[in-house]
């Protein structure tokens, strides 16, 4: 019996393990975590014939090498163990690539980008599903991709997929050497994850590899970096713009754009823009890319319009929570870098009280700070980044900030200040990762939502 190592006991790792076990492999999951909370899960998987090694760092013994190693998205591709595995020519892939091996008989839509990919994925899935297609979303949202593969291996009634809609991070691109979508979308590109990918050029090449393998490529022409590369790359691609037909980087027959408050796709009027309820130009960009994918998939414009009219957005992405004393509380916890946080501020009314901070990331904060100076009457700083953010704001001659450290204190203080200063919006848009205080950006956003709902 062939042996597979799974690195990481998260949702995707467990799904990959169950998938391989169903397909007749001997499966060993390795995870460096030692929490007692994992013991019941370890026992449950053992009962299914899957070995789980906790507090374990894998190594490659020449006498007992696996035939396959599957890596969870959070595991760096350049760890010594994985480098050695590839040097020994052991088949080493990510969980998404494993799913592709089982699901490639269905066409895929693959969505990648620094920001915007989650909302775009949700839009694509809503349109395809609204058109009565069996088109589940997976990757960073929806299912783990191998959960879909497992359903197919078990021949479940729901596993006859018309399309697979996959949100694909740079980590997943990096560990997926063969994944080849029918339709590939690239939403935005700015500096992010450089602590992992080292250089901007390397980060770009990792993203681009997915598009090169896609049969059809769709790009956001309003993204400055992608626009610039589009002048000399991607000659046959489909392009979008919110700035009208004259700003397309392709012939209008291959473009999707906004003209006179209508969405036009490949030369045909699709829907009036006022059907789409999400705020911000960035969400209009996401909309155009989703419509481009839908039209390439042959979906009728009536089905597209119906899906868009009922689409309410995605949790943690400019998610409206409630209004208290005329002040809107907005959850933008997914804004884990400066560019996303800048977009968050661009999308809400002013004056705004901003809650920011967390685990600091590298990046250019100038445009974000410019938006703070333009729209924000008070910044409440939380998490590890609070001191550095305070210093940076002070150095940029912005002094309306307070260090409050925790979300609980931020919510309590924000309502008091909002009433005093007549704010229109209290916005959580952290410009940081969440791992200093939370398990994930979702965990952070859920805590924000819970605290907001408790306000009297």
From Swiss-Prot:
Residues where ATP binds: 113-119
- In which pathway does this enzyme or protein participate? Cell wall biogenesis; peptidoglycan biosynthesis
Q: Does the record bear ATP-binding in its keywords?
A: yes
Give the Gene Ontology MF terms in alphabetical order: ATP binding; UDP-N-acetylmuramoylalanine-D-glutamate ligase activity
Coiled coil start-end: none
Catalyses which reaction? UDP-N-acetyl-alpha-D-muramoyl-L-alanine + D-glutamate + ATP = UDP-N-acetyl-alpha-D-muramoyl-L-alanyl-D-glutamate + ADP + phosphate + H(+)
Q: Report any Pfam family annotated for this entry.
A: Mur_ligase_M
What GO CC annotations are associated with the protein? cytoplasm
Give the keywords, sorted.
ATP-binding, Cell cycle, Cell division, Cell shape, Cell wall biogenesis/degradation, Cytoplasm, Ligase, Nucleotide-binding, Peptidoglycan synthesis
Query: Where is the protein found, in the record's own terms?
Result: Cytoplasm
The residues forming the signal peptide are none
User: EC number(s) per UniProt?
Assistant: 6.3.2.9
**Where is this protein chiefly located?**
cytoplasm
GO terms classed as biological process: cell division; cell wall organization; peptidoglycan biosynthetic process; regulation of cell shape
**InterPro entries attached to this UniProt entry:** Mur-like_cat_sf (IPR036565), Mur_ligase_C (IPR004101), Mur_ligase_C_dom_sf (IPR036615), Mur_ligase_cen (IPR013221), MurD (IPR005762)
SUPFAM superfamilies assigned to the protein according to its UniProt record, in alphabetical order: MurCD N-terminal domain (SSF51984), MurD-like peptide ligases, catalytic domain (SSF53623), MurD-like peptide ligases, peptide-binding domain (SSF53244)
Function noted in UniProt: Cell wall formation. Catalyzes the addition of glutamate to the nucleotide precursor UDP-N-acetylmuramoyl-L-alanine (UMA).
Against HAMAP family, the record matches this protein to:
MurD
Q: What family is this?
A: Belongs to the MurCDEF family.
* Protein name per its UniProtKB record: UDP-N-acetylmuramoylalanine--D-glutamate ligase
Organism encoding this protein: Crocosphaera subtropica (strain ATCC 51142 / BH68)
Gene for this protein? Answer: murD
